[in-house]
């Protein structure tokens, strides 16, 4: 059983969204138990590590889980992992696989990053240009198939090889970008969120284009001997090719 259902975009009704996300995870686990499924696959997120100035260059699966408290998507992903681990302790026969993925990119991408680059003017943070990771949508599908056929279990970070910076992304997609001071952009983002001018994110989302939050995929390579077809750069390029 593969659990992918999740509220991706932030909402202003945090309690309701949390209930949908966490109850959805519990329902999926119950379905796996009732159907006597052999394997449960959960698509988590590298955002659960949080974007912080003291992050190491590469975050591994044993790094601290510290999602930004106001970035609900990451908070609920981390809470869902906890529910799954608790369930696993009482259901030893079920193979549980947790995939902590970076943003999925490709021709059909629809996430907070892809939407930012579809706007007439791209906003950047002055003096900040962190490396980003992406995984191509085809690589996600291929990995799921590999995991099911081989009944893989455990927790793995997944991301395309290498990184690409925010400014490099803007050049590839030929976006007009303006860089604002961090304090000003944070203020404008928070005001526009509170006044409902925009519904993408409160100011906590800006940390993900301010600080590094790159995840190591060494465990995936060494334990499973698995390699993705697309790098982070080429995954982004396929999105650009579709949009330009």
Stretches with model-predicted labels:
Residues 2, 41, 97-99:
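Hydrophobic structural elements of the Rossmann-like NAD(P)H-binding subdomain
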Residues 141-201, 217, 236:
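Mid/C-terminal beta-alpha module of Rossmann-like enzyme folds, strongest
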């Amino acid at each position: 059983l593969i659990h992918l259902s999740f509220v991706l975009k932030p909402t202003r009704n945090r309690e309701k969204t949390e209930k949908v996300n966490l109850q959805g995870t519990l329902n999926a686990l119950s379905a796996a138990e009732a159907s006597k499924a052999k394997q449960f696959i959960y698509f988590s997120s590298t955002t659960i590590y949080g974007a912080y100035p003291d992050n190491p260059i590469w975050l591994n699966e044993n790094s601290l889980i510290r999602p930004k408290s106001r970035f609900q998507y990451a908070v609920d992903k981390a809470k869902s992992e906890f529910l799954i681990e608790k369930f696993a302790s009482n259901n030893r026969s079920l193979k549980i696989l947790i995939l902590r993925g970076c943003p999925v990119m490709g021709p059909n991408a629809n996430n907070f990053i892809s939407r930012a680059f579809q706007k007439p003017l791209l906003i950047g943070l002055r003096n900040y240009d962190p490396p980003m990771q992406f995984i191509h949508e085809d690589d996600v599908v291929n990995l799921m198939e590999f995991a099911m056929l081989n009944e893989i279990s455990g927790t793995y970070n997944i991301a395309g090889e290498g990184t690409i910076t925010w400014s490099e992304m803007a050049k590839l997609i030929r976006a007009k970008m303006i860089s604002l001071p961090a304090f000003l952009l944070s203020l404008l983002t928070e005001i526009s969120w509170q006044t409902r001018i925009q519904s993408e994110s409160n100011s906590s989302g800006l940390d993900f284009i301010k600080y590094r939050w790159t995840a190591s995929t060494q465990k995936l390579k060494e334990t499973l001997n698995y390699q993705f077809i697309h790098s982070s750069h080429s995954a982004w390029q396929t999105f650009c090719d579709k949009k330009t």
